[in-house]
Amino acid sequence: MLPEMTDEQRAAALARAGEARRKRAEIKHLLKSGSLTFSDVLERAESDDLVAGAKVAAIVAAMPGMGKVSTERLLSEIGIADGRTLRGLGKNQKELLVERFS
């Protein structure tokens, strides 16, 4: 069961969630436009919890030339689960993804 929240707590949680969505959408837009590299996103994830919580599949799908099928195929090849976040990637998985998008 979820804990009861006061109106102020609920408003603060909604604001945090909105900020996370905006930041992740901005990252995906910058990736799609080529203004940001996959390595840049991994660097940001080390210092920014909102970026670190982004799903790997969503970030990979935002890369130029990547769609739903090619993203699923790549993540399967590397051994990355669908729900994995950037924070949860292992060293080898990061290296393989950076190599793929270099």
Model-derived regions: residue spans:
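Alpha-helix boundary/capping and short turn/kink residues
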Residues: S47-L50, G65-K68, I80-G83, K91
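Helix-hairpin-helix
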Residues: I59-L75, G90
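Long, highly charged, low-complexity intrinsically disordered interaction regions
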Residues: L2-M63
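Accessory alpha-helical DNA-binding modules that contact the DNA backbone or grooves
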Residues: S76-S102
